[in-house]
């Protein structure tokens, strides 16, 4: 939905920009202001009170959303032998080693997440410049460098999301689809916020959750009250 379209302007008029909504109210409003032509993704953007230029203020983590994301992620796995077989059995979409690396070097990027066994990381490092900027580089901190590839595949397929603060101290992550019931969106939101709060760097001073906005890919931003850090499904 173009921001200049009549439909977008009508949707934006439903949002009181001077108000801070509860997570449940924001979820309901996101559903109401989304385009009806497609099942839009519901996203959260957070401005954190950290300085991401400092190593001790980096915020990066994963969380399993209780109701999933509404999308079955395509997963690539770098593994060989029994580990490769386990990845295939767990539902990985593409599994390989040197052959997969060559395919990616040739432009293949038709996957949403990548997992690697530890012994494959020296090889995967050859495509770090391709995977890294796209948030696809396997990393032990997010559980995507692991000998237990079957569990990692199952977690991602089941609704596990990754998040990482960017250079402007913003976090972005998905909490579901506009077709979700608002209480399920609020519960997914709560699970993610709980993890973001748990990861607060000790070096972060002042307000940690400075600004939060919920929106769909086709709708306006909805300001959420950052002080609501429990009872996420209450209006």
Curated annotation (Swiss-Prot):
Pfam families: Ribosomal_L1 (PF00687)
BP GO terms, sorted: regulation of translation; translation
CC terms in the record's Gene Ontology section: large ribosomal subunit
Signal peptide bounds: none
HAMAP family referenced in this protein's UniProt entry, alphabetically: Ribosomal_uL1_B (MF_01318_B)
Record's function text: Binds directly to 23S rRNA. The L1 stalk is quite mobile in the ribosome, and is involved in E site tRNA release. Protein L1 is also a translational repressor protein, it controls the translation of the L11 operon by binding to its mRNA.
Similarity annotation: Belongs to the universal ribosomal protein uL1 family.
Protein name: Large ribosomal subunit protein uL1
Provenance organism: Mycobacterium marinum (strain ATCC BAA-535 / M)
Taxonomic path: Bacteria, Bacillati, Actinomycetota, Actinomycetes, Mycobacteriales
Gene that specifies this protein: rplA
């Amino acid at each position: 939905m173009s921001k200049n379209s009549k439909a977008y302007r009508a949707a934006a008029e439903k949002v009181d920009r001077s108000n801070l909504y509860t997570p449940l109210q924001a979820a309901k409003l996101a559903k109401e202001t989304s385009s009806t032509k497609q099942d839009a993704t519901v996203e959260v953007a957070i401005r954190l009170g950290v300085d991401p230029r400092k190593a001790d203020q980096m915020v990066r983590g994963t969380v399993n959303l209780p109701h999933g994301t509404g999308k079955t992620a395509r997963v690539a796995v770098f593994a060989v032998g029994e580990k490769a077989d386990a990845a295939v059995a767990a539902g990985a979409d593409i599994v390989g080693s040197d052959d997969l690396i060559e395919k990616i070097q040739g432009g293949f990027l038709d996957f949403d997440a990548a997992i690697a066994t530890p012994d494959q990381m020296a090889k995967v490092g050859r495509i770090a410049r391709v995977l890294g900027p796209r948030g696809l580089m396997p990393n032990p901190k997010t559980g995507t460098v692991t000998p237990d590839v079957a569990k990692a595949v199952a977690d991602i397929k089941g609704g596990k999301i990754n998040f990482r603060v960017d250079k402007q101290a913003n976090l972005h992550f998905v909490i579901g689809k506009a077709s979700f019931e608002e209480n399920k969106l609020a519960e997914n939101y709560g699970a993610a916020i709980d993890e973001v709060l748990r990861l607060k760097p000790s070096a972060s001073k002042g307000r940690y959750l400075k600004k939060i906005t919920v929106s769909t890919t086709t709708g306006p931003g909805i300001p959420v009250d950052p002080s609501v850090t429990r009872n996420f499904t209450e209006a």
